[in-house]
Amino acid sequence: MSVSTASTEMSVRKIAAHMKSNPNAKVIFMVGAGISTSCGIPDFRSPGTGLYHNLARLKLPYPEAVFDVDFFQSDPLPFYTLAKELYPGNFRPSKFHYLLKLFQDKDVLKRVYTQNIDTLERQAGVKDDLIIEAHGSFAHCHCIGCGKVYPPQVFKSKLAEHPIKDFVKCDVCGELVKPAIVFFGEDLPDSFSETWLNDSEWLREKITTSGKHPQQPLVIVVGTSLAVYPFASLPEEIPRKVKRVLCNLETVGDFKANKRPTDLIVHQYSDEFAEQLVEELGWQEDFEKILTAQGGMGDNSKEQLLEIVHDLENLSLDQSEHESADKKDKKLQRLNGHDSDEDGASNSSSSQKAAKE
């Protein structure tokens, strides 16, 4: 379904015009789950269709528990089941992912900051050093106890088991091993803050550079509710002289609270945005070559989401038959922090912790 309007088309033309008038400029992208929904991957927070909504009717203590490190320690099976469905290789990149690859090929891509854990930016061909996965990914694994790093195959091999009978444990400390996905209660990777510190300084340098070769940078935010900090703070920290673009179905975050005169707002699906921007830039032929070489995009089917919910529902029903009400109550109390003197300690620093977009 298209949501294009005359105003969105005009905004896309302005983006293309900015890039054409600054031929040596580079672009920073900040993206969220909205760029992957056309691939069949659910986002987390959309009412009625998001992953949390579809998990809400299951027997988990609360939907977000599947990404809770404490719950994972007590019961890894729900996450293993979900990971089996979401694991890289089950989905193909969208047109927007290939737009990132096109920008890289045109040497105008500075960085992609992504909240997504699906690694579809990598699958589309974007180089590792241009991607900052703020909430981690399946690209490697680590022990939740001592931090020892493991190759992803160690975890993936367990997902091939049917049914999953045991879990990967560290050969050093014996704790569980999981993909390097940031769970609730875990810090974001150091690369996130370190790279953004350098890139924000780079932005300031570029807007003060004068000369014969215009290179005013551009920051494009796509497919995110900007509801999760610290990622949501990035648009706020963009220097005021840098043009910001938001492509999203709704105006969100700092674009809504503190809209700047130079901001461009595009209410559009990310794939439509990619198509129109490529057309305005005159890059259709190169874009088609990328799409052809990669064998096409992910489809728009929601069948994968239904399979995820079905598998988790069966898992939860099976668990409920073998778990006493008393055990459930104790588990829920522990997760809510009622058996700890440090109840609420994590909340005091929650703005610095990661959550899923």
Swiss-Prot record:
Binds 1 zinc ion per subunit. Residues 317-329 have a biased composition (Basic and acidic residues). NAD(+) binds at residues 32-52, 115-118, 223-225, 248-250, 270. GO terms for molecular function: histone deacetylase activity, NAD-dependent; histone H4K16 deacetylase activity, NAD-dependent; metal ion binding; NAD+ binding. Changing I117 to A/D/H/W/Y: Nearly or completely catalytically inactive. Zn(2+) binds at C143, C146, C170, C173. Transmembrane segments: none annotated. InterPro entries: DHS-like_NAD/FAD-binding_dom, NAD-dep_sirtuin_deacylases, Sirtuin, Sirtuin_cat_small_dom_sf, Sirtuin_class_I, Ssirtuin_cat_dom. Keywords: Acetylation, Cytoplasm, Metal-binding, NAD, Nucleus, Phosphoprotein, Repressor, Transcription, Transcription regulation, Transferase, Zinc. Its cofactor is Zn(2+). The modification N-acetylserine is found at S2. Its EC number is 2.3.1.286. This is NAD-dependent protein deacetylase HST2. It comes from Saccharomyces cerevisiae (strain ATCC 204508 / S288c) (Baker's yeast). The lineage of its organism: Eukaryota, Fungi, Dikarya, Ascomycota, Saccharomycotina.
